[in-house]
């Protein structure tokens, strides 16, 4: 999105933000049809036949992060000053924490590993693309917090993005 969004979206004569919205709406429409028919797509869990899938939750959350997170007036990857660590955090922290929770049945170990990875992502983005250090320090734990609650109402793919995104929105006036 940050590097090639302009060229990809231009194939459909759209701006990058319009393209993100259109793809998200398309995924949500397909998800509504899937739910109505009770189809379980390969890779989905059986219970997802009756509720919004992890894929749909994740797509919605990523789209919101791309649409809401400010770009700091920058271009290219530097425009991902906040969106990139939010999305990368979920992408890298979720599978590690999930596997540790499943294999070791140890939430504490999962949280510690998640914090190490999340801080690595956020502080790495501080060094790489200039993410504010205050945002990195305060928002990294929110990624991990998004993995902890076990609920069928909203998938952790969404909460791991929406919690730091919400924190960012509240923190922005101070940055």
Report each predicted region and the residues it spans.
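Interhelical loop and helix-boundary elements at the membrane-water interface
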Residues: 1-20, 29-175
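Selective transmembrane alpha-helices of multi-pass membrane proteins
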Residues: 23-24
């Amino acid at each position: 999105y940050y590097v090639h969004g302009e060229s990809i979206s231009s194939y459909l004569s759209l701006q990058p933000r319009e393209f993100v919205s259109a793809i998200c709406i398309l995924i949500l429409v397909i998800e509504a049809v899937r739910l109505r028919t009770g189809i379980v797509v390969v890779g989905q869990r059986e219970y997802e036949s009756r509720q919004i899938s992890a894929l749909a939750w994740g797509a919605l959350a990523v789209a919101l992060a791309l649409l809401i997170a400010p770009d700091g007036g920058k271009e290219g990857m530097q425009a991902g000053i906040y969106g990139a660590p939010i999305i990368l955090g979920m992408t890298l922290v979720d599978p590690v924490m999930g596997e540790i929770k499943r294999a070791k049945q140890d939430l504490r170990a999962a949280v510690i590993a998640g914090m190490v990875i999340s801080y690595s992502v956020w502080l790495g983005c501080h060094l790489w693309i200039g993410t504010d250090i205050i945002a990195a320090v305060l928002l990294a734990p929110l990624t991990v917090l998004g993995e902890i609650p076990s609920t069928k109402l909203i998938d952790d793919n969404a909460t791991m993005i929406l919690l730091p995104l919400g924190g960012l929105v509240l923190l922005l006036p101070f940055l």
